[in-house]
Amino acid sequence: MDTSPLCFSILLVLCIFIQSSALGQSLKPEPFGRRAQAVETNKTLHEMKTRFLLFGETNQGCQIRINHPDTLQECGFNSSLPLVMIIHGWSVDGVLENWIWQMVAALKSQPAQPVNVGLVDWITLAHDHYTIAVRNTRLVGKEVAALLRWLEESVQLSRSHVHLIGYSLGAHVSGFAGSSIGGTHKIGRITGLDAAGPLFEGSAPSNRLSPDDANFVDAIHTFTREHMGLSVGIKQPIGHYDFYPNGGSFQPGCHFLELYRHIAQHGFNAITQTIKCSHERSVHLFIDSLLHAGTQSMAYPCGDMNSFSQGLCLSCKKGRCNTLGYHVRQEPRSKSKRLFLVTRAQSPFKVYHYQFKIQFINQTETPIQTTFTMSLLGTKEKMQKIPITLGKGIASNKTYSFLITLDVDIGELIMIKFKWENSAVWANVWDTVQTIIPWSTGPRHSGLVLKTIRVKAGETQQRMTFCSENTDDLLLRPTQEKIFVKCEIKSKTSKRKIR
């Protein structure tokens, strides 16, 4: 088991504990009303510290000032277009992170859907002890709400045409902007990118981002692995649709092997850089959805990642599925929906999901421990030797269900090659044992029979059944590869459904 993420999470939690203890604060969710009152008394100290930047033809931000309509003209604000505002999170070094400029460029690269692209720069309030930065989120949210009200009054920009994209603490800033804007109409959309967990997990909806804060709220959870009661990203659902890539706890390609060397060289500031991989993956998944609009990542409703890994949750009936990122289908719901998907370790992050159901008949008296590989041939591409491990071994007459993901679109699946990947030595032992020991009343080589392979493609929702090309020999032997082709099987269940 890889213990590096565990060690890192413990270090992060200890850092927050140390900060909180130094400030005499508790990490338990505290009613935000008391915090807000303390912040409001010092509001004049922070009056001008939040900046609102607009990005025109260049990626150099132009500052918009509330009650200064001339700045709108100077910055090239187009009131006929929607407004998308990016809100960053907690800062350790006081510097705006590189992903901001990547997202700005990605948003501006949508010629079919032009928008005003803005940034809420609250770096001076975010660059502080975490607990203090948390307290500042409500204040900054109110300032964002004030900006939106002013734009509505001065240039008639409808708040329903506003999309706030908040990362980490910025997600909760977005929520406070939505809850404090007032009036009968809500902000159009809020996207929470791995919304911060500490001091928000388990709190009331009014004290964090929640579905009530906008007409539509979507959230992407990428670093929710919990230790000592805390997780970097919030784990609980906070939107109308909550996406959990790879289960949401940790992300592929995020290696912690260099963590200890970095700490030795740079001190505990190295933790901040290491955390970015999984926490910031939410940002890059969202950017990826903008850059690869033609290949959106599909997500599927499921109870948990364990069920999803068995391929049990690929049904998209009645519009149950949705796409992750900018182009999500916006459907407000009365109850949050949790969706799961698998991604690659790098952009483009999209994979293709398949459920495989394999029916084995083990005619021996004990479970067979072994590994297999599958090679898939599609109308577009082929994939060779995908490893398959079936838990505790193959018991008698059982169907196994599991999820396979592919990095490429192979088209329609037309053939499967299934191989028992034991050594030739094991094959000789297998034959010898069967010669010595008679297996019940069956034929000499009875043992492991592979009857059918049923497949469901998540992205296309196509169902297929594959049978052995040689129907006279269904026995699978060590080192042997069998070819399976499409076939039609009418089961009793399907007959009942037809009726």
UniProtKB/Swiss-Prot annotation:
Q: Which reaction does it catalyse?
A: a triacylglycerol + H2O = a diacylglycerol + a fatty acid + H(+); a 1-acyl-sn-glycero-3-phosphocholine + H2O = sn-glycerol 3-phosphocholine + a fatty acid + H(+); a 1,2-diacyl-sn-glycero-3-phosphocholine + H2O = a 2-acyl-sn-glycero-3-phosphocholine + a fatty acid + H(+); 1,2,3-tri-(9Z-octadecenoyl)-glycerol + H2O = di-(9Z)-octadecenoylglycerol + (9Z)-octadecenoate + H(+)
What are the alphabetically sorted keywords of the record?
Disease variant, Glycoprotein, HDL, Heparin-binding, Hydrolase, Lipid degradation, Lipid metabolism, Secreted, Signal
Residues modified by carbohydrate are 42, 78, 362, 397
Q: What's the superkingdom here?
A: Eukaryota
Return the CDD domains for the record. Pancreat_lipase_like (cd00707), PLAT_LPL (cd01758)
| Location of the protein in the cell | Secreted
What is known about what this protein does? Catalyzes the hydrolysis of triglycerides and phospholipids present in circulating plasma lipoproteins, including chylomicrons, intermediate density lipoproteins (IDL), low density lipoproteins (LDL) of large size and high density lipoproteins (HDL), releasing free fatty acids (FFA) and smaller lipoprotein particles. Also exhibits lysophospholipase activity. Can hydrolyze both neutral lipid and phospholipid substrates but shows a greater binding affinity for neutral lipid substrates than phospholipid substrates.
Q: What is this protein called?
A: Hepatic triacylglycerol lipase
| Organism from which the protein derives | Homo sapiens (Human)
